[in-house]
Amino acid sequence: MDTAGIRLTPKEIVSKLNEYIVGQNDAKRKVAIALRNRYRRSLLDEESKQEISPKNILMIGPTGVGKTEIARRMAKVVGAPFIKVEATKFTELGYVGRDVESMVRDLVDVSVRLVKAQKKSLVQDEATAKANEKLVKLLVPSMKKKASQTNNPLESLFGGAIPNFGQNNEDEEEPPTEEIKTKRSEIKRQLEEGKLEKEKVRIKVEQDPGALGMLGTNQNQQMQEMMNQLMPKKKVEREVAVETARKILADSYADELIDQESANQEALELAEQMGIIFIDEIDKVATNNHNSGQDVSRQGVQRDILPILEGSVIQTKYGTVNTEHMLFIGAGAFHVSKPSDLIPELQGRFPIRVELDSLSVEDFVRILTEPKLSLIKQYEALLQTEEVTVNFTDEAITRLAEIAYQVNQDTDNIGARRLHTILEKMLEDLSFEAPSMPNAVVDITPQYVDDKLKSISTNKDLSAFIL
């Protein structure tokens, strides 16, 4: 697995995070150092490696200030498997719900997909060539071979012919005639020139087995995996366009070309050494003394999470995985509870703590304009597909930021997420009418913003409905 990103210096990591996330420099520095320490550890001898564990991080800050985005972007920068889980989804072992080990199994699933996607990319040309060969045969088929008659020893018992399931001539063809060879040569040329992309072709694809709905979540998943391994793969015939068929066939051939067992082992190692698990809403399982009944359950979840953070061997469908060197990032607003309300053992497993700042009007302005694909650029690009040009003035952007900030102050503070719904509300009419406005140019001014959002910015009851 290519993990060249792990060799980035902390400054380079922060620089890459700055392309997508505004502010929160302290949090960016801490995650950058954590990533660099992983690279430093990889350079040590085996004995030293085993002694050094990642320093888990606890992010403290209100919703919508960038906690999840920092962790997700960090994982993308280094090509590490990453999952986000919510602590409130877990229950104590023995109760209905997800057990804490499921987050490790989910991480391994992500790791397997990452490794296999990279390995498939290395054989993509060969797989596509095989897919094109198959498409030529499907578009110009030969005569099918007749099913061979084989003696079945059970025939005499049942008084008739018994189909021999060991012989499968379904896909066997007679040798192509000269006429078919000529036609295939012409079809191959047209395929290479892209002239047949929209033509329909019938292919056989593996059918997804139905889910078992009568069991609990984890039981369901484990039983489903067991049944999938025992049951033969069922194929169904579908009629699709050539371009779609090529993707399906190439993906199937790529699966055959890579060493599945080697990929699984590489994925397990990647999850162990580079995996990042983001545990959101960890403050919701912190205990206080106001409700002893709930506190018992919350403490149970914390104590179940603790062994995973300390290092446990978890069984997955790909093999065992050790969590000792995975990086865990806990996050929560901690409005009601405090980090000290977590059980002491769990507090000790998050030695690095960082408080994220609430967002100001200036931060909102930067969020709207600075990131690589900022919200303003996204909406401009979307409307440009309808040949509608939208120009936001600087004053209009500032006015949008002021309204978003004010609504956050007057109602629930949901941080930068407020900008999404404010923008969506403001551009609702334009988005609806855009298909009938070709070549239109629309200037978004402070007056335009006020006209569209006046009722929201002045009516607290109404602004409560703008999430």
UniProtKB/Swiss-Prot annotation:
Keywords in alphabetical order: ATP-binding, Chaperone, Cytoplasm, Nucleotide-binding
Keyword check for Manganese: no
Any one biological process term the GO annotation gives: proteolysis involved in protein catabolic process
Intrachain disulfide bonds: none
GO cellular component labels: HslUV protease complex
Record's subunit section: A double ring-shaped homohexamer of HslV is capped on each side by a ring-shaped HslU homohexamer. The assembly of the HslU/HslV complex is dependent on binding of ATP.
Name recorded for this polypeptide: ATP-dependent protease ATPase subunit HslU
Gene name of the record: hslU
